[in-house]
Every structure is written in C-alpha cells, then in structure tokens.
C-alpha cells in the first residue's frame, strides 16, 4: 500500500467527488452560522442541514467538503493515542439525488482504487434492526455487490449504527461504517467466532479502526416515536482525515501522522522528550499537539478566551496545554504560543486563515498562557497546602470551589492533580457551592427584571427627547430600589434625554436633580415604550411624581456622537476600498473608541487600510453635513440605505445620511457636521476568523493624545539613537534587531562555554551511591537546549551508570534537567526525581525515565532543590536518606 501524505488524501478525495458531479464547498467556520444554540461545528453535515430539512433549496443536489470540526465531549480523554478535539472531516452529501447504491459503491471505489487500500483489509457494519426499523438488508446487498464477503458484514444496534433525529422528531436513518483491519495479531480474539472482537465490538478497538461512516437519511421520526419513509432521501458521510492518514501512513495512532509530526517535533525540541520515551510524557506530548491545533483553529475563526461557551473551550485547552508545558516541562508562555504558531505554519497551506491569523494566534495564546502561569503558581501553592492538611482520600468540594471562584484556579486542574495523587474530589459538594453562587446571581438578575416588569405593569410611557435636547425639565413616573445595591434606584422619566444602550452605542450618563437632592445616572436600559435609568443617590430622597431636571454628560455624549458618525464613515470607506461585499457584523461605539466588525472574504493589505484611513480623514476635514430623517422602510430601500442583516425594522425607520455618500438605518446619536469628529486614527485591524475582521479606531482628543504620544516617543528614540530625524528610525530599528540577535547568540555561546568548562569540576565531585555515580550542581546556561547539552557532556565524561541533575537560572526561572543512564532509570526514574524536587522551586515537572525537566519561579530555592535531589537518589539507590 502506497505511503500517502494527508495533503494528497485531501486532494484525491475532493477530485474524486468533483469528477462525480459534486459541488466542492469550502469548510464552514468552527463558529456555527446563525445558530447560537450550537457550541461549535462538530460534523461536515452542519452547513447542509437546511437542505436536508427542506428549509432551503440546494444550488446543486450533490456536495463534498473538507470540514473543520471541534468536539468537546472527550476533552478529558485527550492524551491517549486516539482521542482528539480538532479534526478534519471529509464528506460527500446527496440532497434527494443518489442514495445507498452510489454512496456505498463510491466509498468502496475511493478506498480501494483511489487510495489503494487492499480490499481484504476492509470490514463493514450495518444496522441490525429493532422493533421500530428493519435490518438494513439493502445496504448489505450493495456491500456484497461491490465485493465485501458476507462474513465481513456485521450487524450493530441502533446505539452504534443509527443517526438522528436531532430532536424528538425529524429526519433519521441507519448508518453503515467501514473499518480498517490492522491484522489478527492485534486482536485478542476471533471476530468470526465472537462479534465482541469484531468491528464496532467492545473488544475490537485494538484491531479495527473505523474510517468512514455512511448515514442514510430515509425516515422521519414522529412525535409518538414511530417512523415513516421520507419523501426525499439523503446521504451524509464522514471520514476523519486523521484516521485515514494513520491507515495510509502505517501508523497505529493519529498522533504518528504528518498531521501532528511538526508540532510534536517542535515540542520535542523544547522538552527533550519524544513519543515513546514514557507513558506520562507521551500523554503530555499528545495533549500539547492536539490542543495546539485546536487553539490555532479556534482563534483563526474568531474565538477568544473567556468564561462562556466556546470562549471557555478555548481558554480551557490553552490552560490544559499550559499545565503540561509549564507544570511538567517548565516551558514559558512564549514557547507554548510557538507550538500554536507551528500549527499555523505547517497547516496554513490548505487552511489559509491560519496563515492570516498567525500573529494573532501567537498573541492570544501567549497572553492567556502567561496569565494562567501566574494563576497556576498561586493556585498550586494553595492546593498543595490543602492537600497536606487533608485527612483521608476525599477533597472537599467547598475548598475546590473557593480555589475556582476566588483564585481563578480551574476545577478541572484541581481534579487532574487530585487524580494523580489518588485523591477523589467531592463533586456533589462542589456542585452545591456552585449552585449557591448561581442562586445569588439569579436573585440579583431577577431583581432587575422585577423592577422593569413592575414599571411595565403600570402601563407607563416615556418619550425620548435626546435627539433634540441634552437637558429636560421632566417628572419621575416610576421609581424602584435596585435589589442588593444600597443607594441605587431604577426610575422612568416622562421625558428622557438619556440614550439607552442600542445599535452598538453605549448608554448616556449624567445627572437628575431637584430641590430634594441629586442622582448620578450610570446606565440607561431600553424597555419597549420607555427607558429604565439606573442611578446612584448622591444626596436627598426621590419619589414618583417629583419634578426634576435631567441632564446628560454633554462632553461624554459628544465623544460618543463623534465615534458613531465616524463608524458610518468608516463603513462607507471600507466598502469603497474593498468592495460592496463588506458587511457589518457588529460594533461598539463608546466615548473612548469605536470598534467595527465586518465580514470580508479577502485579505486586507496595509495599502488598502491606509486608503481607508485617508478616505475617512478626507470626509471629516471636508466638514460634510449629517442629516437625520424618518421615512418608510420601502423608501429607505430605494435610497440604498444600508440595513443590518437579521435586524427587524418597523414600517417607519430613521435614516442617518452623511452628505449623500453614506446612508444607514440608525437610531443612534450623531454630530451635525463631520469636522466635529476631529482627528481619526485606525489603531488595529485584526482578522477574527476566515472572513471576519475587527477594526478599532480612536477619534477627537483620544486620537490627538495618541498621535502626540507617538510623535514624542519617536522623537525621543531618534534622539537616543543620535539620528538626524524620525524618518531614519525604521532602518535604525532593523539594524539594532540584527545586532541584538547576534549579541544574544554570542551570549548563548559564552554561557554554554562556561557551562562546559564547569563539567570537569562536576565530574571530579561526583558522588557514588551503591555503585551509581551521582552528579548534581548549578551551571551557567542560556537555554534548556544548552543545559541538556551540558548534562550530556557530564554523563559521557563520567561513563557507566550515572545520574546527572543540573540546575540553571534561565531568564529568571529556576530549571532542573535530569539525565540518567538507562541502567539507573531501572531503579529510579528521572521524571519522578525532578517532579518531587520541583515543588521546592514553586513549580512542576516530569519526563521520561532517562530524561526529564522541571521548573519554578523560586531561584533562591535551587540549592534546596538540588539537596532534595540528592536525598531522593540516596533513598532510591541505597534504600536510605542521605
């Protein structure tokens, strides 16, 4: 069988189905389009579901794709040879066109002829039937027609070979799976005698690998659970690229394929351990490889670390990778980010969004990993202290929740650390503590909703006068205290000048005053026919019916208005430079800055961005008039006014027009003339996914401050470098960068030389414990690579059974490297030694029996850590403490 790279498998798959009249679709984003109920894209079929459900008519009845997928259900299992989070799904689909005969025939043809897999290596499964649906004899017949012997076709129950429906009702049907047979030497039993040892059997995983699943949508499940035939059948297939690559590359694990090799090799360079060195380090390398791929693709598609939904998935895999990289191997945040960068480098050829987002991937991962390293330091100290006080083998859930809630230490890390120590977590106690906190949050939220509902029940109406006036003499219609917030009130005014949050624009703030006292308005919340103001009592008392003067913060409003009009001009300029395909995807308009998210499939060059900035400045300096008027929705359409996709509009709409070149439906507040915006500076334009960009801008005083500071900084740098002018800076910086790189290399070589010069002294002072030479000491080194080289030199100079453990200060961090002769590792493992000593340094570590690494932040503890190493080696090698 031909050894085949993953890129070639992808190409052959798409070519095969294109030749059979399939339209080739690009992968959809990992963020499901227009479906907030779905966390992440988990299958190739997701982008085609509207076609299967009959909600949309497909442009072509046949489709094929390579789809990015991310599944979280087995996240805790990642680290073994088979489980993944991110993967690529090869799939072909039929929407009422071909059915089982063609799907089975083409799958067989592609595997046996397109890839050259020997037919005798392939087994298949079909649905065995139950009380609701018969055995899939049709699929069995087609498999036998292509040449599969009957004894290699296994029937499996609905739990294994049935798909759908997605809810209680809807399309569903039997599946048929294709398995690759690694050979009888890998199986514990004969599948022909006992189906448990066959494909899909509970004991068959070691021998059989599922490579392709064919789903036959032929039934509709009704509310009573019964099935009826679909008028339009469908085909949905999925073949994991990682699995078929393992088959084509003769690998027993997906992690041994070219889809993982570059990132695993980079991890090996950083850690000094390779796959096969030991069970624990193998698990760590697989976690690093999988999570590096996952974080790179999630970030490229616009996900950022956070505490909700998919944002938390990204945060969790970065933190899980950091725990292994830093806690076990002592790698810093930069090295962790470099692993994700490596993924962008070697997978960016096919997945262009990775290449585009490479810098952003590094920035996000490095920032999140650095934050977690700080959390990990403090959290591990607290966790270790709690473990030392523990009586028994059960860790209190309340304590785990406090670590999580107060100190930000993730419960999954607590869970993993405890499992490694053989301690269980009181999960019920943790859930109770979590629920108590949620109940407190619910009560606060319900209090807010109760206040709004109470106003609504009174059938009050408030008139917004903020377009015309910045101050209003008005009356309080209703007032309620804010639950659990002493001195704060919710209130509704008869005439209200405060703009309530909406359309991306933040709410106005300001003051409400009367003879009785004064309130500071901190928020304005839209609530249908009125706006609810949230205010702090500065002095006095207020009640419904009071006559008051409401005044917005005028300076703040002007800054917001400038940014909102600038957003409209920016939108126009982007469409003028990049084309009409630019579509707004979201915005933030505040007093400090504006943020504009837009969809665009191409790459935005620096030249294009400069042109956008130039056009915006031109329109601002021309002092173009800004008009607002109300018209019908139909008339607004005729005028070409831009409308937000998915937004619901009434019959009458408000149009904001900037001198005829920009028209948008908008309910926000704006300047009267564009010159009021003042300065305008684009500060960033970052890609947040395959076709999503986020541009940020500052205007007015903020922009002037920014430009003034930038000019002052440039002048100071030019003076410091003794340059005639700031225009010489770019060339000077480039020259300095080259000199710095050269100096760093010279320092590294000098440190390595000093370290190697210390080898003689270390060898002379070697101890002997029960026939084993032991060398420990602190040496000079520039990085882990040099430290390992020095340890190799010591081991070679001593010769025979020797245990070498060296320490160094690497950029302010204490790092230990253990290098053991194989004979020594049979009695004591290098990974165990450094892991135990690492606690003294305030960190963690691990590795293989012969080579390991640890690190921590406490440099002053290096002598104590080395002394602990000597004690451990004395205990393990001679049976007594030193």
Curated annotation (Swiss-Prot):
What's the record's note on cofactor binding? Binds 1 zinc ion per subunit.
Claim: Protein biosynthesis is one of the keywords in the record:
yes
Entry EC no(s): 6.1.1.7
Keywords carried by this UniProt record = Aminoacyl-tRNA synthetase, ATP-binding, Cytoplasm, Ligase, Metal-binding, Nucleotide-binding, Protein biosynthesis, RNA-binding, tRNA-binding, Zinc
**One MF annotation (Gene Ontology) recorded for this entry:** aminoacyl-tRNA deacylase activity
Which Pfam families is this protein grouped with?
Answer: DHHA1 (PF02272), tRNA-synt_2c (PF01411), tRNA_SAD (PF07973)
Q: Please list the reactions this protein catalyses.
A: tRNA(Ala) + L-alanine + ATP = L-alanyl-tRNA(Ala) + AMP + diphosphate
Task: Name the cofactor(s) required for activity, per the record.
Answer: Zn(2+)
Where found, per UniProt?
Answer: Cytoplasm
Which GO CC terms are listed, alphabetically? cytosol
List positions binding Zn(2+).
564, 568, 666, 670
**Family statement drawn from the similarity comment of this UniProt entry:** Belongs to the class-II aminoacyl-tRNA synthetase family.
Record's domain comment?
A: Consists of three domains; the N-terminal catalytic domain, the editing domain and the C-terminal C-Ala domain. The editing domain removes incorrectly charged amino acids, while the C-Ala domain, along with tRNA(Ala), serves as a bridge to cooperatively bring together the editing and aminoacylation centers thus stimulating deacylation of misacylated tRNAs.
Which protein are we looking at?
Alanine--tRNA ligase
Q: Tell me which species this is from.
A: Rubrobacter xylanophilus (strain DSM 9941 / JCM 11954 / NBRC 16129 / PRD-1)
Q: Which gene encodes it?
A: alaS
């Amino acid at each position: 069988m031909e050894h085949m790279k993953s890129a070639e498998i992808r190409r052959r798959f798409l070519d095969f189905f294109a030749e059979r009249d399939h339209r080739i679709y690009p992968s959809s984003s990992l963020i499901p389009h227009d479906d907030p109920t779905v966390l992440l894209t988990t299958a190739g079929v997701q982008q085609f579901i509207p076609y299967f459900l009959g909600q949309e008519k497909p442009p072509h009845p046949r489709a094929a794709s390579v789809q990015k997928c991310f599944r979280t259900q087995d996240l805790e299992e990642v680290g073994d040879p088979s489980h993944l989070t991110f993967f690529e799904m090869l799939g072909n689909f039929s929407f009422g066109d071909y059915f089982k005969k063609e799907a089975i025939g083409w799958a067989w043809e592609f595997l046996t002829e397109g890839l050259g897999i020997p037919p005798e290596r392939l087994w298949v499964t079909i649905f065995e039937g139950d009380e609701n649906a018969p055995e899939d004899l049709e699929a069995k017949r087609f498999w036998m027609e292509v040449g599969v012997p009957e004894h290699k076709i296994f029937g499996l129950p609905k739990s294994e070979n049935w798909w759908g429906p997605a809810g209680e009702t809807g399309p569903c049907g039997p599946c048929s799976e294709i398995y690759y047979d690694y050979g009888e030497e890998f199986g514990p039993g004969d599948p022909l005698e006992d189906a448990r040892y066959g494909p899909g059997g509970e004991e068959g995983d070691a021998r059989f690998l599922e490579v392709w699943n064919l789903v036959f949508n032929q039934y509709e499940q009704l509310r009573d659970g019964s099935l009826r035939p679909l008028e339009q059948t469908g085909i949905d297939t999925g073949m994991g690229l990682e699995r078929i690559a393992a088959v084509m590359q003769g690998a027993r694990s997906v992690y041994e394929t070219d889809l993982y090799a570059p990132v695993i090799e980079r991890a090996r360079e950083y850690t000094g351990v390779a796959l096969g060195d030991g069970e624990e380090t193998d698990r760590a390398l697989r976690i690093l490889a999988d999570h590096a791929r996952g974080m790179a693709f999630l970030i490229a598609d616009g996900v950022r670390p956070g505490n909700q939904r998919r944002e938390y998935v990204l945060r969790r895999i970065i933190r899980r990778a950091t725990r292994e990289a830093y806690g076990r191997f002592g790698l810093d945040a930069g090295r962790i980010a470099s692993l994700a960068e490596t993924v962008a480098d070697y997978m960016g050829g096919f997945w262009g969004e990775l290449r585009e987002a490479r810098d952003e991937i590094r920035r996000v991962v490095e920032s999140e990993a650095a934050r977690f390293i700080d959390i990990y330091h403090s959290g591990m100290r607290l966790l270790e202290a709690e473990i030392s006080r523990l009586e028994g083998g059960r860790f209190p859930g309340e304590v785990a929740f406090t670590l999580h809630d107060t100190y930000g230490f993730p419960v999954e890390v607590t869970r993993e650390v405890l499992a490694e120590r053989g301690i269980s977590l009181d999960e019920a106690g943790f859930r109770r503590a979590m629920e108590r906190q949620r109940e407190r949050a619910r009560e606060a939220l319900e209090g807010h909703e109760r206040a709004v509902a109470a106003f609504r029940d009174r059938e009050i109406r408030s008139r917004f006068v903020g377009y015309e006036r910045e101050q209003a003499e008005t009356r309080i219609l209703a007032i309620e205290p804010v639950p659990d917030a002493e001195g704060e009130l919710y209130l509704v005014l008869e005439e209200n000048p405060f703009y309530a949050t909406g359309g991306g624009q933040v709410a106005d703030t300001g003051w409400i005053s009367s003879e009785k006292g004064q309130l500071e308005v901190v928020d304005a919340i839209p609530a249908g026919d009125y706006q609810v103001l949230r205010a702090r009592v500065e002095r006095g008392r207020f009640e419904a019916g009071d006559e008051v003067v409401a005044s917005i913060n005028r300076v703040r409003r002007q800054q917001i208005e400038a940014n909102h009009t600038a957003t409209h001009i920016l939108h126009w300029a982007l469409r003028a430079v990049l084309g009409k395909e630019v579509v707004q995807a979201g915005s933030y308009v505040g007093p400090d800055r504006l943020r504009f998210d837009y969809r665009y499939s191409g790459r935005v060059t620096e030249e294009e961005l400069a042109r956008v900035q130039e056009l915006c400045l031109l329109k601002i300096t021309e002092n173009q008039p800004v008009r607002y008027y109300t018209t019908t929705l139909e008339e607004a359409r005729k005028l070409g006014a831009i409308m937000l996709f998915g937004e619901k509009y009434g019959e009458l709409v408000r149009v904001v027009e900037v001198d005829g070149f920009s028209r948008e439906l908008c309910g926000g507040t704006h300047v009267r003339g564009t010159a009021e915006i003042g300065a305008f500076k684009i500060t960033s334009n970052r890609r947040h996914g395959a076709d999503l960009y986020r541009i940020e801008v500052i205007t007015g005083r903020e922009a002037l401050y920014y430009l003034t500071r930038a000019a002052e900084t440039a002048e100071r740098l030019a003076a410091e470098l003794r340059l005639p002018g700031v225009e010489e800076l770019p060339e000077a910086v480039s020259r300095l960068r080259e000199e710095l790189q050269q100096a760093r290399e010279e320092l590294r070589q000098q440190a390595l030389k000093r370290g190697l010069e210390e080898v003689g002294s270390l060898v002379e002072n070697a101890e002997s414990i029960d026939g084993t030479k032991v060398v420990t000491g602190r040496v000079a080194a520039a990085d882990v690579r040099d430290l390992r080289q020095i340890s190799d030199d010591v081991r070679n100079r001593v010769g025979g059974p020797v245990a070498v453990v060296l320490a160094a200060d690497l950029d302010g961090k204490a790092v230990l490297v253990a290098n053991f002769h194989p004979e020594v590792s049979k009695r004591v493992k290098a990974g165990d030694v450094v892991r135990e000593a690492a606690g003294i340094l305030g960190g963690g570590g691990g590795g293989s029996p012969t080579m390991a690494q640890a690190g921590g932040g406490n440099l002053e503890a290096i002598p104590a850590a080395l002394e602990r190493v000597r004690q451990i080696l004395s205990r393990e090698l001679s049976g007594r403490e030193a």
